[in-house]
């Protein structure tokens, strides 16, 4: 089974000059803004709402208490905050088939990543397609990692 590539042309980078130097928590969006940036990518893709930008989602996250000092964005920004933005979010079990089913249905999948290829501590990424063998990823912090294909086995032990 292959899934169409979700047309997430709005691949936002957290360090984009348009918002990278906006305050987010104890630092800048460029440094700690992967959560709001991923939610902005998914939200913009799903709704077409041009107000779904990383800086606006970051402000929403801070006002809503979704930023945890010393950590960054709480998972509740995705699991609960998305609903307050008019989106529907649901948590998936760590099962490849569930992820590919979501993509096949046209839904981006936001993953919280632990130490590994994407981060030394914590990071959010967006799965955008499955070609039957590997996923494509929108990494808000890396053009290089976003241009690679990732097998489930490569990602599995890094997903929190």
Task: Give names to the regions the model predicted.
Residues 1-66:
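Active-site-adjacent structural segments surrounding the nucleophilic cysteine of cysteine proteases
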Residues 43-44, 48-160:
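Conserved active-site-adjacent core of cysteine acyl-enzyme catalytic domains
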